[in-house]
Amino acid sequence: MNYTPYSSPAPGLTISPTMDPVTWVYFSVTFLAMATCVCGIVGNSMVIWLLSFHRVQRSPFCTYVLNLAVADLLFLLCMASLLSLETGPLLTASTSARVYEGMKRIKYFAYTAGLSLLTAISTQRCLSVLFPIWYKCHRPQHLSGVVCGVLWALALLMNFLASFFCVQFWHPDKYQCFKVDMVFNSLILGIFMPVMVLTSAIIFIRMRKNSLLQRRQPRRLYVVILTSVLVFLTCSLPLGINWFLLYWVELPQAVRLLYVCSSRFSSSLSSSANPVIYFLVGSQKSHRLQESLGAVLGRALQDEPEGRETPSTCTNDGV
């Protein structure tokens, strides 16, 4: 994750008619990633606007979804900035290096926050499935807000320490940087992702069991969570293991270049996908064009089985 202080994967590359095929692929995927970032920025901004300023039907997971949208938006803004710095001489070399490093730090902060928030969503949904009585009657009222605050603080602390040991302007000790990266990436890949996979598997098994026994469609919230987790694991995992490949595996420069740009595109796609998932799951075929976006989003996050959806207007904290 932090293998060089100013780790542009394609130093000195410029667009020209004489570019080799690898460079053409790099710039093509990069521009595709930038277009994806723009779409994702619009989509996540819309989700934040609807959950913050519109009175929509909400589930107890509206706080998590709002925070996840903020993390995705921040990630996409930083990714778009990094790609812009790499593909165009927008700043002087020294200023560009500092801006690039700052954007990279914020990007990984947002990535860590998004991963931990999605893990919290699947874990809390799993607890509600395994212990429904406790979840309904004894769960602390402001649990969602507290958990989100703790996860943001943890992500900030992790990335502050990584920045302190890995940024050349502060503490350019590569050995210390390596150890810090090993600890933090082991935490991400050894705890967060396994917990996300395990809890999602439990949700999927319970969803399938209920669907077969009761012969009705699964709750939309189940579909939203499972789809979001699947997209994250499929598209964002390459960025999560980026550090491992760059540290331990000797790859040709062309392969490294293609892997980095493809992992950036897939992670941008992952952060842009959640708004699409919400609106696809929440929409009804017969009223797809007539309903407001707030109603569609509220239905996607409604914590009620099909056929029992009732309006609820919880606040972001009182969940």
Curated annotation (Swiss-Prot):
May regulate nociceptor function and/or development, including the sensation or modulation of pain. Functions as a specific membrane receptor for beta-alanine. The receptor couples with G-protein G(q) and G(i). Residues 52-64, 114-144, 206-220, 282-319 are cytoplasmic. Coiled coil: none annotated. It comes from Rattus norvegicus. It is found in: Cell membrane. GO terms for biological process: adenylate cyclase-activating G protein-coupled receptor signaling pathway; angiotensin-mediated vasodilation involved in regulation of systemic arterial blood pressure; G protein-coupled receptor signaling pathway. Its main location: membrane. Pfam families: 7tm_1. Residues 1-30, 86-92, 166-184, 242-260 are extracellular. GO terms for cellular component: plasma membrane. SUPFAM superfamilies: Family A G protein-coupled receptor-like (SSF81321). It comes from the Eukaryota. Keywords: Cell membrane, G-protein coupled receptor, Membrane, Receptor, Transducer, Transmembrane, Transmembrane helix. Belongs to the G-protein coupled receptor 1 family. Mas subfamily. The chain crosses the membrane at residues 31-51, 65-85, 93-113, 145-165, 185-205, 221-241, 261-281. This is Mas-related G-protein coupled receptor member D. One of its GO terms (molecular function) is G protein-coupled peptide receptor activity. Co-expressed in the small diameter neurons with P2X3 and VR1 in dorsal root ganglia.
